[in-house]
Swiss-Prot record:
Pathway(s) it belongs to: Amino-acid degradation; L-tryptophan degradation via kynurenine pathway; L-kynurenine from L-tryptophan: step 1/2
Pfam family, one: Trp_dioxygenase
A biological-process GO annotation: L-tryptophan catabolic process to kynurenine
Binding sites annotated in the UniProt record for heme: 346
Highest rank taxon of the organism: Bacteria
Cofactors that this protein relies on: heme
Protein name according to UniProt: Tryptophan 2,3-dioxygenase
Molecular function as annotated in GO: heme binding; metal ion binding; tryptophan 2,3-dioxygenase activity
EC annotation from Swiss-Prot or TrEMBL: 1.13.11.11
Keyword entries, A-Z: Dioxygenase, Heme, Iron, Metal-binding, Oxidoreductase, Tryptophan catabolism
């Protein structure tokens, strides 16, 4: 066996190493000479790229209807690959949302973990932005090219993507908002096999439902525990909301006065005044949870706490302990916006390629996709509060701002 070179070979004959390093190097060399297989085993067992990524398995999944890639044309191969990529993106989104859901499941939620939740939401945004770009690849498929193999897809549909349904469930989409596909009573029915038996997609969705409440549920629980101006009592929440709505009315009066100063005609001023008055009344009903007469007292109390927390965090975001909560809320809003844009872009791609014909799964096609983009919102309170926020000078003063500063423990 060739002798292993000493340290001087690598450092130069005239180089000097510190004595501890020289001793350590000699111990390592003696160990390798005594047990040469110890270092070699790592080399022979190192993973390679194609095994780690499972390249061959991935490249064997584009066989189409007959599981024979030789019978698949370039256009159909593109169609298959892009949809497979979407499913992989959905898998990553589900991982990030699940991690965030599990974080907010905790009570209390550790403040130092909020940054990781914000990163998860930002990653989901980036994935959706990347997925939107993939529609450009799909649009290289002409109408006639797609029609050559489209009929063979019937009754398959993108609606049957179990992972997309999982994302909706994990976020917390209300079943009452769901738009019927066109031929079944429940979205779960579309996931069954042709003979009505449960499929792998059905089992996946059922497992997601069994995994527990949604991200929105736990987010609302977290928000409802937020101290409002130092208090978590219902009376303190209502007191803050009434103070805030008074400030809103004062701000609207200021805007009316601006209209008068700019010489708007009296009828225009009155129309503007009536509009602002209606806005103020609607805002007060929303914040005090009086916008749903059918809700019971406990539900209204919870909604007041959640909505007060959103307004409070947004209005006083400069306070140190509110900075990360505000970042989380902003990232969630950005995430839902990205998903809505993805839905809208999906609809425009479909319209460009096949127009407004009936979908392969029996849906209204583009009309169905457009409706999902308009109606499928999970975090409605976050969107509504954007209409209610005030300029910084108009935000009411709070008494316990010091409660939201950084905490520095006294030295012993």
């Amino acid at each position: 066996m060739r002798p292993v070179p000493g340290p001087s070979v690598f450092w130069g004959a005239g180089s000097r190493l510190p004595a501890p390093l020289v001793a350590r190097a000699h111990r390592l060399l003696r160990t390798r000479r005594a047990n040469p297989a110890r270092g070699a085993s790592r080399i022979t067992k190192d993973m390679n790229y194609w095994d780690y990524i499972h390249v061959e398995e991935l490249l064997a999944l584009q066989g189409g209807f007959d599981d024979d890639e030789q019978k698949v044309g370039n256009d159909e191969a593109l169609f298959i690959v892009v949809h497979q990529i979407y499913e992989l993106w959905f898998k990553l989104i589900l991982r990030e949302l699940t991690s965030a859901r599990e974080l907010f499941r905790q009570n209390p939620v550790p403040d130092q973990k909020l940054a990781s939740a914000a990163r998860s939401f930002r990653r989901v945004v980036t994935i959706f932005e990347q997925a939107i770009e993939h529609f450009r690849v799909m649009e290289t498929l002409t109408t006639r090219d797609y029609l050559d193999f489209r009929d063979r897809l019937i009754p398959a549909s993108g609606f049957q993507s179990a992972q997309l349904r999982e994302i909706e469930l994990l976020l917390g989409l209300d079943d009452a908002l769901r738009i019927p596909l066109g031929r079944e009573g429940s979205y779960k029915e579309a996931l069954k096999t042709a003979d009505g038996a449960p499929s792998a997609a059905t089992r996946r969705v059922e497992a997601r439902l069994a995994s527990g409440p949604s991200l929105k549920h736990f987010l609302d629980e977290w928000l409802s525990r937020t101290p409002i101006d130092g208090s978590s009592e219902p009376e303190g929440v209502v007191g803050f909301l009434r103070s805030y709505t008074r400030s809103m009315r004062q701000e609207n009066e200021r805007r009316v006065q601006m209209a008068i100063d700019k010489a708007l005609t009296p009828p225009d001023v009155e129309r503007l005044r009536a509009r602002y008055e209606a806005e103020s009344a609607a805002a007060e009903a929303f914040l005090l949870a009086e916008d749903d007469p059918a809700a019971d007292a406990a539900t209204r109390e919870k909604r007041r706490a959640v909505r007060a927390a959103i307004v409070f965090i947004e209005s006083y975001r400069e306070l140190p302990r509110l900075a990360w909560p505000r970042e989380v809320l902003d990232r969630i809003l950005e995430m839902e916006q990205a998903m809505l844009i993805w839905r809208q872009r999906h609809a425009r791609m479909v319209e460009r390629v096949i127009g407004r014909r009936t979908g392969t799964g029996g849906s209204a096609g583009v009309d169905y996709l457009d409706q999902t983009a308009l109606r499928y919102r999970v975090f409605g309170d976050l969107w509504t509060v954007r209409s209610l926020l005030l300029r910084k000078p108009s935000v009411p003063e709070i008494e316990h701002a010091s409660d939201y500063g950084f905490r520095v423990e006294d030295s012993p």
